[in-house]
A protein has these predicted regions:
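Serine-esterase "nucleophile elbow" of acetyl-processing enzymes
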Residues: 2-74, 84-93
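Conserved catalytic region of serine esterases and O-acyltransferases that act on ester linkages
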Residues: 2-16, 173, 196-276
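Short, solvent-exposed loop/turn segments at secondary-structure boundaries
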Residues: 43-48, 80, 108-113, 154-155
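Cell-envelope and extracellular/periplasmic
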Residues: 72, 76, 101-103
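Proline-aspartate-enriched helix->loop->beta-strand connector
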Residues: 89, 93-98, 103
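Charged helix-capping and loop-helix junction motifs
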Residues: 113-121
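A short helix->loop->beta-strand "cap" motif at the edges of active sites that frequently abuts
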Residues: 129-134, 176
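Substrate-gating cap/lid alpha-helix
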Residues: 144-181, 202
Length: 276
């Protein structure tokens, strides 16, 4: 027996109006979902191996949220949001849902804009139906941030553009608010990035938190900010990158290297087909 599809019921209040209404909410509940950038990787403070508050935790702190839950997972893709993370959002019924996803999708050979849009649309509609404000963070330009050869970074950049367009389309349909990063000069500065150049630094996480809060016109309620100073030498940063990067590469290279090679080949083939 097939279960009938539940129709989406548009809320009586827009997402922009809901953002303004949150200025008067004292017992705010916030939940974060997405990948490692949401999980807090890169926000290490004085201890590089650790994972810190992240930009979502910093927002919760700055807004003095009564409750904050982070259900993000390292390596998560858009397809994981509806099945693995959305149930917690529905159960938690937060005032605000913070989302950042897509980096792991653009790195895969089976990159599918249709799948990404469908998954995000499901998440956004479900969150809005329970009265939540949906905030989606746009992705930065990999050409200016990511490591690796320029040929690969150009492909990643083209795919990030597609994801950002999907986010804008969803926002245009009233399914959330997008906070862009692509055109931000500060967001792409080296100091805003962790030594791995794949995740924000502690300063970068705080910059994102401030950008999101200001975009929503929400005043900072906390008297003090979480520190962003990192008292670690460049020598130790390089040591950490080499040792930890080597471990990561040894673990992932079996399927990562072929995937990246195929990524460049398949993208060139796709562009040739579309140009005919």
């Amino acid at each position: 027996m097939n279960t009938p599809i539940k129709p989406f019921i548009a809320p009586l209040i827009s997402q922009s109006e809901l953002a303004l209404a949150l200025r008067h909410v004292e017992d705010m509940r916030i939940i974060a979902m997405g990948d490692s950038s949401v999980f807090g990787v890169g926000d290490h403070g004085n201890d590089i191996p650790s994972v810190g508050f992240g930009w979502t935790g910093r927002i919760a702190h700055d807004l003095k949220a009564e409750r904050f839950v982070n259900v993000a997972k390292n390596g998560a893709r858009a397809r994981h949001l509806p099945t693995n993370q959305l149930p917690a959002v529905i159960a938690y019924r937060p005032h605000m849902v913070l989302i950042c996803i897509g980096t792991n999708d653009v790195l895969r050979g089976d990159f599918s804009p249709e799948e990404i849009r469908s998954c995000l649309e499901t998440v956004c509609k479900s969150a809005i139906e329970i009265g939540s404000l949906v905030v989606m963070l746009g992705l930065p330009d990999p050409i200016r941030t990511a490591p690796g050869p320029m040929a690969l970074r150009r492909i990643l950049s083209d795919r990030v553009i597609i994801i950002n367009e999907i986010l804008d389309e969803l926002a245009g349909d009233g399914l959330g608010i997008v906070v862009p990063t692509w055109n931000s000069r500060i967001a792409h500065e080296r100091r805003m990035w962790h030594v791995d150049r794949m995740h924000p630094s502690a300063l970068g996480h705080q910059h994102i938190a401030d950008s999101v809060r200001r975009h929503l016109s929400l005043p900072r309620r906390s008297a003090k900010k979480i520190p962003t100073e990192v008292n670690v030498s460049k020598k130790f940063e390089m040591y950490w990158l080499i040792t930890n990067g080597a471990k990561w590469f040894a673990k992932r290279s079996i399927d990562l290297v072929p995937a990246l090679i195929w990524l460049m080949i398949s993208e060139n083939m796709r562009k040739r087909r579309s140009s005919k």
